Amino acid sequence: ENESKELIRPFLVTYGTHIRRKLDQNCWINKIKDSVEYCSANSEIPVITDVRYENEAAWIKENDGVIVEIIRQSVAPANEEEKRESLKLMNYRDFVVSWPTFGDDSMAECVGFARSFLSDIQCVLA
């Protein structure tokens, strides 16, 4: 599985960065915009799980969003592009979580960690 991921990832990065974003820098924003607006209009909290570029982070903040950066412990950025872009996002983040790497049999521990973090965020945002 890791071999396949390492082989395919450069193609996906090239498509997403060097083709898709060159055609429309806001392509990912435009893709989720209607869903986010629908959630907000219906008192739901939209969650965007992958923000890679400064214009995406700026759009979230312009729409009263909160940005949580989750950094997995002992895992470096996947490539130079990710490393470079993540530095640009630092000014937009509201929270940073250092996420431990859990084993396959550690779901309860993972859930406990997530609940604790979400509780902390609720206290700050309240």
Residue ranges and their predicted role:
Residues 49-51:
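Short His-Asn-centered micro-motif
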Residues 44-46, 66:
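Short active-site oxyanion
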